[in-house]
Amino acid sequence: MASTSNRNFFSSNMTQIPMDEKIRIALQFNNLSQSTKQTLTKVYCALAIGILTATVGVLFSMFIYRPGFLMTLLLVIGSAILFATTPRTQDYKTQVKRFTLFNLVTFVTGMSSSGLIELYMDINSSIVLNAFMATCGIFISFTLFSLLTNKRLYIFIGSSLASLSIGIFVLALTRLFGGYSEPLDQLFILAILASSVLFIIFDTQIMVHRIENLGEKDVLFHAFILFYDFVDLFRVILKILAKKENKNNNKSRR
């Protein structure tokens, strides 16, 4: 039934349907079971809460209290380990504990990013908001692509990520020992951006596979993985926009 609905969506008959109706049909996600859609709704609600908590962590670190680098690092690692090692049982007490730990992880991750955000705000205060909006747009776009397609691309993407990671490592070594080169630096940043996008597709499709085929409906764990995909993409876009702003400022001074 689901595959038939999906085939109908891409059939030539769909050309006669208005665009808004096509979008409505697509967003019904008929290729996914009802149980999977319910789980995904909870996952993305948890992710939204995590992003909001991280934002609070950034503001807390900027305006109230900023711990040292070592303490922040220990807090991030410690909270992540606590979250990952807490039993994934479904009883109420454990779920409350894991939800608290999940928000602690996102909060301290936000704290750890505050210094970087302040640095880029000094260049141009609009960079951070633009980077966040761009991150949301890219993340949502590739998430929808991953959910709407019937083809499970995670095996192909996994091998591509492995090759890309090796390429990024080689580029990093070249930058470290070969001196600064503008084209090489741009290639390095674009490679990291590509890997961030591929991780969104890979992790989303792996999540759907585990929910549908393995019955792994651990909402908080899936949200935890996607949260770091979002944060990594945000940091990369932030760096790209800041680099572009610096370049424009240098041109205007000449």
From Swiss-Prot:
Family of this protein: Belongs to the BI1 family.
GO cellular component, one term: endoplasmic reticulum membrane
Subcellular location: Endoplasmic reticulum membrane
UniProt keyword annotations, A-Z: Endoplasmic reticulum, Membrane, Transmembrane, Transmembrane helix
GO molecular function, one term: calcium channel activity
Chain ranges on the Lumenal side, renumbered to this chain: 65-66, 120-126, 174-187
Protein name (Swiss-Prot/TrEMBL): Bax inhibitor 1 homolog
